[in-house]
Design a protein with these regions (language model features):
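Small-residue-centered hinge/linker elements
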Residues: 1-65, 74-80, 84-164
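Amphipathic alpha-helical substructures
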Residues: 166-185
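Glycine-rich beta-to-alpha transition loops that act as phosphate-gripper elements at the mouths
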Residues: 70-76, 175-179
């Protein structure tokens, strides 16, 4: 399912909640009866924050026991992010994986509010206090700020993949750029 920051934030009940999965992985790490962990991943991605939480938990878990990821239908974007730290990754030939990329979007309902005659006033402390305001388009400074954040996140994702798969960042960048791969091609 979708990787989310908290329960109930996914459109379905099958969401992968970052804090819950991380907590469960820590319990497995501390359980001496568990000798290895197979993590079945079936996710098209989701929250970068929750993916990072789970990535850290997988990395911590593998300091004490082997972690094997078994990819199902999807392990793309955040699904790949949480997988790449594993010791071993196994994919089905038809698994869709990769999609090493990040995007952000904020709706702009200005056209709608203009049509219905809705107006608003804003009082703020500085020029970015209402960053993400959906009642107007981004200004150039806000676009640059969002792009900087997205680029930082993408570079972190590339670094996590490189570290987890024991590859250089340059090698990861050649196969990244948001492209999706079948399990067979991967």
């Amino acid at each position: 399912g979708e990787i989310t920051d908290y329960a109930g934030s996914s459109a379905s009940d099958e969401g992968i909640v970052g804090s819950k999965v991380s907590r469960d992985l820590r319990k497995l790490k501390d359980n001496d009866d568990v000798k290895a962990v197979v993590l079945r991943v079936n996710s098209p991605g989701g929250s970068a924050f929750a993916s990072e939480q789970i990535w850290h938990a997988v990395k911590e878990l593998k300091t004490k026991k082997p972690v094997i990821v078994s990819m199902s239908d999807y392990a793309a974007s955040g699904g790949y992010y949480i997988s790449c730290a594993a010791d071993t990754i196994v994919a089905e030939p038809t698994t869709l994986t990769g999609s090493i990329g990040i995007f952000g979007m904020v709706p702009n309902v200005k056209g709608l509010t203009d049509k219905i005659g809705l107006t608003y006033d804003v009082v703020k402390t500085n020029k970015y206090s209402d960053f993400g305001n959906i009642m107007r388009p981004f200004n150039e400074g806000e676009k640059a700020l969002l792009q900087m954040t997205i680029t930082e996140g993408y570079n972190t994702f590339i670094g996590r993949c490189a570290e987890g798969r024991h590859m250089t960042k340059e090698a990861i960048e050649k196969i990244a750029e948001g492209r999706v791969w079948t399990g067979e091609a991967a």
